[in-house]
Swiss-Prot record:
It is an enzyme of class 2 (transferase). It is found in: Cell inner membrane. The HXXXXD motif is essential for acyltransferase activity and may constitute the binding site for the phosphate moiety of the glycerol-3-phosphate. SUPFAM superfamilies: Glycerol-3-phosphate (1)-acyltransferase. Coiled coil: none annotated. It comes from Vibrio vulnificus (strain YJ016). This is Glycerol-3-phosphate acyltransferase. It catalyses: sn-glycerol 3-phosphate + an acyl-CoA = a 1-acyl-sn-glycero-3-phosphate + CoA. It is a peripheral membrane protein. PANTHER family: DIHYDROXYACETONE PHOSPHATE ACYLTRANSFERASE (PTHR12563:SF17), GLYCEROL-3-PHOSPHATE ACYLTRANSFERASE (PTHR12563). The gene is plsB. Keywords: Acyltransferase, Cell inner membrane, Cell membrane, Lipid biosynthesis, Lipid metabolism, Membrane, Phospholipid biosynthesis, Phospholipid metabolism, Transferase. Its EC number is 2.3.1.15.
Amino acid sequence: MSSGQSFSHSLLKLPLSALVKGTAIPSNPIDDHHIDINKPIVYALPFRSAVDLLTLQKHALELGLPDPLSPLEIHGKSLKRYVFIASRPTLVQSDNDVPSDSIALFSDLLALHAEDSELDVQVIPATVLWGRKPGKEGNNKPYLQAMNGLQKAKAVITAGRDCLVRFSPVVSLRYMAQSHGTDSSIAHKLARVARIHFSRQKLAASGPDLPSRQVLFARLMKSPAIEQAIEEEAKSKNISMEKARKEAQDIMDEIAADFSYSLVKQGDRLLGWLWNKLYQGLNINNAATVRRLAQDGHEIVYVPCHRSHMDYLLLSYVLYHEGMVPPHIAAGINLNFFPAGPIFRRGGAFFIRRSFKGNRLYSTIFREYLAELFAKGYSVEYFSEGGRSRTGRLLPAKTGMLAMTIQAMLRGLNRPVTLVPVYIGYEHVMEVATYAKELRGKRKEKENAGLVLRTLRKLRNFGLGYVNFGEPIPLNQYLNEHAPEWTKDIDPMGASRPQWINPVVNQLANKMMTHINDAAAANALTLCATALLASRQRALSKDSLIHQIECYLQLLKNVPYSKTYTVPSESAEALVEHAISLDKFVIETDTMGDIISLDRNQSILMTYYRNNIIHLFALPSLIAQMIIRQENLTVSQIQQQVAEIYPFLKAELFLSHKEEELDELVVKVLNELVSQDLISLKADKVAKNQANTLTLVLLGRTISETLQRYSIAFNLLVSNPELAKADLEQKSQDIAQRLTRLHGINAPEYFDKGVFASLFSTLKQQGYLDSDGNCDSEKTAQFATLLYALLYPEVKLTIEESVFQLKSA
């Protein structure tokens, strides 16, 4: 570096340190991008800019990366550690050519690779973005453009606190040299590729240009589908075309978002304060996968589970802080009340009625609006379950939005569309007490400003929040596999609804929900709730609770559930202490130590948190229950019984393991139970270890309530094979409700109608009922006997008596 450059850099550092507070994306690029700091590193920046270079230097050093201003020494040659892909324009000219010194550096590096087969220089593309405000539609400026000195000074002053430093995945010059050679033309190609890459980085951070709402509405009104719907509306209601158009305009105004970057920017500060007040921290996992999709130009559709109204804010906040554009969010029309509605709308929410069946004009406009969002490249978010889960379990997907997404693809989108399942978890859900009341029959309170204010008064520390991005589902690839000729149905007019859509959407919905559950986050509260609710008295000594949590942790770590779920890194003791700090348990002390318990009200509320992760333990719990309730089992018998019961658990809990994987999985679970000294395995015989029976019993009881529900339904069918679907569901509910009173079962979902409706579908899929609803009596009786063997005697007796009474009535 020349003395002049060194002096100018020194002059710039002081004002930059005061004005610039940037955010590095990702926050840990060494791990996220698998950067090997022992190999030579060169940074590539889009434009010649001392300000950008110094901003990059500050963040690189903070992140443990080499100083971009330090020389790179290779085989006795001293080289620059940074390159600019384009020259900085002055006030009177603009130069988009690649600087000659950058080409020279690339050429030198490629030549060194030709001489040394072991050399591998890592090029890290780095973009310094000053503000993330999207452009306006109709403005034909490039997404990323250089600034002259005055423009850069203004950007530093106005957007220095909104600066992003994006580190992209490394480009291996060894790979480039081996794949494309080492002549000088490759240096030019490398620079051109980098320029495209930088534009995508800006697009991923700011999003597409935004239209004014009136321009958007005018464009939608010219849609042939909407024009036809308006004509039909006028005819069917016998009103004028002008009145029908006004009705269409009103519907558009009701639906459409009015995205405001300034509100998002200001809201980020408010949300930052809110999360710090509410939560001790946010754990975010697998965001790098989503960033890659955004950078590669995918149309991203976020499909999170729905726990709380907080979900709307949390996911947008997380995406913004991960350097991505907050999505346009499908929100229920019930949230369109003052003042929340206008704020949500400017934050990207578009509103959807709970039902618009039979309203052709509304459904057409909504479908066209959604297709417009996809066509323009805006990321979209809709909640897969339709509404918030009141039980903590993942609900079956509502498929309407998913079907409209597929229909939008049939317009001929020119970008790949990818679903990104998202698991959202909390150690405290603000509405959980309300959910319990609603499940007991209390009418849902309509959302309003008063409800918001009452909620805000309850703000306190709610522990940790979790956002886990699941395995993406590329829709183009999915359709290629499940509807190979789908491209033949592409119709730019949007009239296509081929016959294959419904079955494909139903399969896709199930896959989507499974991927959400695959990304579950176990945490201190969900684990402690699972253990305490498995105890008959909802109480355990502190030592027993710690021991049980340790059992869960070892199972989750040693028998992995999926690639995307997360397990706490803390010890069992630390997790129990953290859960106690959340003030949800009753703590009593005697001469032998602390006893941790749940009162009746908290027992009901804790089922919500247990249900968040019950699927993670479904199979280990089932195996433990088999060992506890049956003597002298062999491994093969356990495998056979698991194979019979698993399809019901898989359908209800969206489990991901395939049936052909079960035998191997059973062996892995058994081996883990052996390593924990809970059971012994001798000559294929399984026996429980009497010294550690409590841990095994608690593990088994996690799934016992689910098995009880199955037993109720199957014993009703054995008693009366001709029961119709509605009767089976109602009688099952009645018996389940009776069991809750007689046996102190506090789970509100225990007699939920939806659970029994799902069970009925699985009965048909597994051949216990044929397509006409006729029962296979022998098969049903055998399965009922198996389920009975897994129940405790007192529960078994209540089911027998209840079935007999209903039959006699």
